[in-house]
C-alpha cells in the first residue's frame, strides 16, 4: 500500500532566491513570491509544514501599478486611539515606504495563522539594489509568464 509523502519540518531544504521587481506588476510579482515562500513550487509541498524558501526582493521602489491605482488605492492604518485612522495612497506609499507596500501585498496572500507569520519572516524586501545577504549566495529567480 502506498502512502502520501508528508514533509517533516526538519527535512526541508531551504534555498535563497533573489527577485528583481523593476518594471514588474505589483500583484503578479507578489503572488509569485508568496508561492515561493509557501513552498508550493516544490514537489514535497505539505500544507501544514513551512517548506518555503527565503526570498530577497530588490528594486521594490520601481514596481509597477496598473490603471489609476497610484491615486485610487488607499492603505489604512490605525493607532488604536479614537480617531486614529490614517489613510495613505499607493503613490505616497511608493515614495515613502516601497518595501512596506510590497510586504503588505505578499502578506495578504499568505495564510492568516502562525504558519503564515512564520513564512512571512523569510521575505526580505529592499527599495534599492543593495542587500546584506550576499553571504547566502542567492540564486536569481526568473518570473514565470
From Swiss-Prot:
Disulfide feature: none
The answer to whether UniProt assigns keyword DNA-binding to this entry is: no
Q: Which GO terms describe its cellular component?
A: cytosolic large ribosomal subunit
| Keyword Ribonucleoprotein among UniProt keywords | yes
Which Pfam families does its entry note? Ribosomal_L13
TM ranges:
none
CDD domains for this protein: Ribosomal_L13 (cd00392)
Q: Which GO terms describe its biological process?
A: negative regulation of translation; translation
Keywords on this record? Ribonucleoprotein, Ribosomal protein
What PROSITE patterns does the record tag this protein with?
RIBOSOMAL_L13
**Subunit info?**
Part of the 50S ribosomal subunit.
According to its UniProt entry, the function of this protein is described as: This protein is one of the early assembly proteins of the 50S ribosomal subunit, although it is not seen to bind rRNA by itself. It is important during the early stages of 50S assembly.
Q: Which family does it belong to?
A: Belongs to the universal ribosomal protein uL13 family.
Q: Which NCBIfam families match?
A: rplM_bact (TIGR01066)
Q: What is the designated name of this protein? A: Large ribosomal subunit protein uL13
Q: Which organism is it from?
A: Brevibacillus brevis (strain 47 / JCM 6285 / NBRC 100599)
UniProt gene name: rplM
